[in-house]
Amino acid sequence: MRSTAYLTALLSFLGATHAAPEGPRCRCTPDQSCWPSPGLWQTLNKTLSGNLVAVKPVGTVCHDPTYNGGLCDSVKGMQTDSSWRSAQPGAVQSINWETWPEKNESCYIDGPRQVPCGQGRIPLYSAVVQSPLDIQKTVRFASKYNLRLVIKNTGHDFLGRSTGPQSLQILTHNMKSINFTDNFVPEGKPDGRGIGQAVTIGAGVQLNELYEAAGKRGLTQVIGLSTTVGAAGGYIQGGGHSPLGPWKGMSTDHVLEYKVVTAGAKFVTANEYQNSDLFWALRGGGGGTFGVVTSVTLRTFKDPPTIVSQVNVTMDGKANESYWAAVEKFQAYLPTLSDGGCSGYYYMLPNVTLGPQSAAVIIAAFYYANKTDKAHVDNLYRPLFASLSSIPGINVASVSVPVSSSTEAFRSAFDQKPPRDGGGVNILGSRLFSRKLLEAPGGAANLTAALSKLDFKNLQPAIGHLVAGGQVAKNTHIQSALNPSWRKALVHLVISRDWSIDSTFAEQEKISTKLTAEEIPLLAAVEPDMGAYTNEADVNEPRFQQTFWGTNYNTLLRVKNRWDPRGLFFVRSGVGSEAWDKQGLCRA
């Protein structure tokens, strides 16, 4: 049987002990004699056809002694443009990951001009790669000189995995190929027969680019709801939730093949038929850990008609018992919505203050893939709306519109040009919650009680992602490294915290520590064994191995040690990262 052969191949190397051999205790840094000379960097630049860049933070032009008024004005105008940020070697989307607070190094674009810039976590050099061969050359160089290596696709990582201090960056952003096929044949498939429609995308392709290309062909694929997130990077390698998830499953469920440059600088194919252990790990085990993915092949589907729906639940004044009663009823009804084909996102904002007015709201953006009957949605909502409207002070409104395709539905949701969702401070905490919990007596009440104990600043939401259940739950036969809790989950719930750019390190630590030690445990206690989604979670999660991967972690670590025995690839709270310090510079 296919599944038996696949599992046998995956486990074939597990009979022996696979402890990673010890390399040097610390990476080489610029203050050491082992650091490559200028001549060696110049040689690498030549082998990369002039595409090696000495990187400075993008805010450098706004600070003395390198201040440039014209360039600073230009950078200030683009600092929230996530498309611009994704293309810059010296920037990521969340600016807290550009800084190195422990060293008091930052370079905020809006910081005081007279404060000199520090390099922070921004890499010192970037290989702006154009091909797998460029990546192989860069990996060999990093390995030979024992350098800290960082992979950046778009810099959307919420756990700071796209930056690293005193490092060499591989920037895959320019690898933009998109190739569709009517009948994809995985490399090495014994019978040579195709397995259906698919698209192969380069490492730098972003979600909006893939939606546009597929939409022109009347196709879609299971990917996220964003403009500039990279489709082939950490998003899909960490699992990849999607508003199409309940219809078809997780994004990683539909990966047919990866092309990868390994820690040994080999260019390999990973699929069900060859290097199947690596294929398994890359389907949920996290990005930046097992190799540099150069391309991904995904299943495509006929783009379905979709109903787009918005639901607003509001009350005047800040959150009180009525508001939290509405939140409880709303969340208790989520299994029914899911059964009706609903997916999407709901934003719980207990504190919305605009001038003298204040309110507490729930705003939901829902999608009904492969549905055309608006009456179905209206009937589905009727019991929920009646229940909510019975709560004193609660008002409910909704609008639902059928559109011809999911691509039209999703692209209209992020049609802002340029996309203005980058350049902020952002740390996350999250937990997965099961359908079983929400259906159980008191389950939604317990979750709501935990939420009500959190601190919410003005306009600060808790975001519920109704992206599981349905086919995500049914795809248990798919063998991947995805956190098994996804197959039981219905909701992925996220909270975020921030601070101002003039906050001291002590103030930042206080906010971060409170998130880790107080707020997330409140949510985790509601359903302790469910864990969290590795791509959108707290970077300081104390038991990240179990929280992000559950029973899959030990196997993932063995795969990691097989393909990267000396730990060339490192990301914060990634597989094998417990062997290193937080910055990946010295072994723990």
UniProtKB/Swiss-Prot annotation:
Q: Which residues carry this modification: Pros-8alpha-FAD histidine?
A: H156
| Keyword entries, A-Z | FAD, Flavoprotein, Glycoprotein, Oxidoreductase, Secreted, Signal
**Residues that span the membrane, as ranges:** none
Q: What class of enzyme is it?
A: oxidoreductase
Q: Determine the domain of life of the protein's source.
A: Eukaryota
Q: Which cofactor is recorded for it?
A: FAD
What name is this protein filed under? Uncharacterized FAD-linked oxidoreductase ARB_02478
From the broadest rank down, the organism's phylogenetic lineage runs:
Eukaryota, Fungi, Dikarya, Ascomycota, Pezizomycotina
Please report which protein family the annotation says this sequence is part of: Belongs to the oxygen-dependent FAD-linked oxidoreductase family.
In its keyword annotation, does this UniProt entry include DNA-binding? no
Pfam families xref list: BBE, FAD_binding_4
Q: Name one GO molecular function term.
A: FAD binding
- Residues annotated as glycosylated are N45, N104, N179, N312, N320, N351, N370, N446
